[in-house]
Amino acid sequence: KLLDLQSYLDRKPKDLSGGQRQRVAMGRAIVRRPQVFLMDEPLSNLDAKLRGQTRNQIAALQRQLGTTTVYVTHDQVEAMTMGDRVAVLSDGVLQQCASPRELYRNPGNVFVAGFIGSPAMNLFRLSIADSTVSLGDWQILLPRAVVGTAAEVIIGVRPEHLELGGAGIEMDVDMVEELGADAYLYGRIVSGGCEMDQSIVARVDGRGPP
């Protein structure tokens, strides 16, 4: 009943869907009353729709049971929506462990900044000149704590933090990816009328993309 499998008790494993089989596997683990659940890529073989449904079911069940769960996944949507804390690893080395919100808003390093988020954060390596850096025709004044410590910095801008307007960063759009409510513009930054070798992604309202 806890797993909503009453209607399938007379079925054989081959007659169950992928999501139902996952719930059966969870049931086998639950009856052992473990102190910790370890789930290793439990949704990797499911299609996108079923993955979303099963993800919500697992999250609801985990909250109901209150059992600590270590969830291993390469899917950041699963990690960000299901985890209280997310540990980001690269080549087996821990990069940052924090809440999903903290990872997104305050990434601990460049790897985490570029990894968390889809599309990924725009990252620009820019040279410092007179306490500022230039991104296209946009001048960014740097904090005093940064000036003098390095010759260049990496500036990160999320796609959703860019807005269409008449002033700011000029870009040539190579492709528009329409996803319904949102659309993503993929292109390159233009400075002084010349295209630069810096790609950029911007999120815009899907109801009227350029």
Regions found by a protein language model. Give the residues of each.
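Non-catalytic connector elements of ABC transporters
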Residues: 119-123, 131-210
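Short, flexible micro-motifs
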Residues: 21-22, 30-32, 95, 120, ...
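ABC transporter nucleotide-binding domain
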Residues: 100-130
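Short glycine-rich loop/turn motifs that provide flexible caps or phosphate-binding loops at active sites
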Residues: 17-18, 26, 91, 116, ...
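ABC ATPase nucleotide-binding domains
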Residues: 1-111
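Glycine-rich, flexible loop/turn motifs
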Residues: 99, 111-112, 175, 200
